[in-house]
Amino acid sequence: MTRARIAVDAMGGDFAPEEIVKGALRAQEELQADVILVGDPDRLRAICQDHAPHLQVRIEAAEEAIAMEDAAVSVRSRPRASINVAMDLVKAGEADAVISAGHSGAVMASALLRLGRIRGIDRPAIGALLPTVIPGKPVLVLDVGANVDCKPRFLEQFAVMGSIYSRDVLGQANPRVGLVNIGEEDSKGNELALASHQLLRNNPRICFVGNAEGRDVLSGQFDVVVCDGFVGNVLLKFAEAVGSVFLEIIRDELPRGMRGKVGSTLLRRNLRRIKQRLDHAEHGGALLLGVNGICIISHGSSKAPSIYSAIRLAVEAAENRVIDHLHQIQEPPSPAADLVTEPVVS
């Protein structure tokens, strides 16, 4: 099997470049992937030498990096920024995917400007995989931050993209799509929800099963749920927080004393498995669906394990030719779709 080539923005993120490079080196050793580190060559070579001197890793020079406090549109005036250089590798066919833990708005802007949109998509969406009560069966939630304000047709397109990804990458034969709403009834919701419900119900390319209340999103009833980026970002951050709080509560309640130590030892084994299911680092990042290339946006606080998982996600998308499948969408986009907006994901 041909090894996937993954361009890694090594200068993006709170713990760049050290943690980014460590995660990338592990991925090159353990996955069917060749990583391309993009950033300051001297710093990257030094880190590679410290952690994996036996590996041959391609390093692509980039003279600048987009900081978290910079405006997303600064990518327009800084062509040699690390995220732009990484995107250019994908555009030139030298890489199959790009990942970045840097400024999410800049990542999206760079992807739009350099890779362009897939024909038929008005606005790309950020899709995050969240755990459900069914082991190994996450739900794809989109949009989680690229588009704060949406039109009904945007949500319809998110549903089609999410269904294609769920089917062709996650292996769900007939992905069940839900619309995040305040009630199960068709008549519930604001104007966006009501209009979107009508479009989703009448679209033959998706298996729309109805509204998804907040309590149902992680229930395993849905394979894909769609919403605007404002709601999705709140949902994503809340899910991450609940997982962390749940683990802390369990730790606090572990029995103490001699009798409790035996039980605690047994519980901790299960606790590790629970942590793996709830930890967002297990998925490593969110997919920017709708641009003409595979792009993974990792959390700004990502460390090596998250970067490794993000590269694994990118490899799966590349091996399953997700972009080829997304090109099934052939409706012409609207004229207003070329606008680069400021996403809310942090």
Curated annotation (Swiss-Prot):
Disulfide cross-links: none
Biological processes annotated in GO: fatty acid biosynthetic process; phospholipid biosynthetic process
Pathway the protein acts in: Lipid metabolism; phospholipid metabolism
Signal sequence region: none
Broad enzyme group: transferase
Subcellular location: Cytoplasm
Keyword Lipid biosynthesis applies: yes
Record keyword Membrane present: no
One of the record's GO molecular function terms: phosphate:acyl-[acyl carrier protein] acyltransferase activity
Keywords: Cytoplasm, Lipid biosynthesis, Lipid metabolism, Phospholipid biosynthesis, Phospholipid metabolism, Transferase
EC number(s) from the headed UniProt entry: 2.3.1.274
Reaction(s) the record says it catalyses: a fatty acyl-[ACP] + phosphate = an acyl phosphate + holo-[ACP]
Record-level GO cellular component terms: cytoplasm
Primary location class: cytoplasm
Family per record: Belongs to the PlsX family.
Subunit structure, as described in the record: Homodimer. Probably interacts with PlsY.
Function statement: Catalyzes the reversible formation of acyl-phosphate (acyl-PO(4)) from acyl-[acyl-carrier-protein] (acyl-ACP). This enzyme utilizes acyl-ACP as fatty acyl donor, but not acyl-CoA.
Protein name, per record: Phosphate acyltransferase
Organism (species): Synechococcus elongatus (strain ATCC 33912 / PCC 7942 / FACHB-805)
Phylogenetic classification of the source organism: Bacteria, Bacillati, Cyanobacteriota, Cyanophyceae, Synechococcales
